[in-house]
């Protein structure tokens, strides 16, 4: 289960994406998480997924 706090979630996701998963889809499949819901949650917190860099970044950058 992933943390609900957006700042902690950001850290966990980016760490997992860097260390273990080659894509958000792979992470979501392995952790049984809904990718679309996760993207919406992170967007509401001000972050977007950068597929090229395989990490979440602030939406204003």
Task: Give the residues covered by each predicted segment.
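N-terminal acidic leader/helix
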Residues: 1-24
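Generic serine detector
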Residues: 11, 22-23, 37, 59-61
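Short alpha-helical "recognition helix" segments of helix-turn-helix
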Residues: 27-28
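Short, charge-rich amphipathic interface segments used for partner binding and complex assembly
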Residues: 32-60
């Amino acid at each position: 289960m992933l943390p609900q706090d957006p700042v902690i979630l950001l850290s966990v996701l980016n760490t997992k994406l860097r260390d273990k998963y080659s894509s958000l889809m792979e992470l979501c499949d392995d952790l049984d998480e809904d990718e679309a819901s996760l993207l919406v949650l992170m967007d509401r917190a001000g972050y977007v997924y950068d597929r090229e860099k395989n990490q979440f970044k602030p939406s204003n950058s």
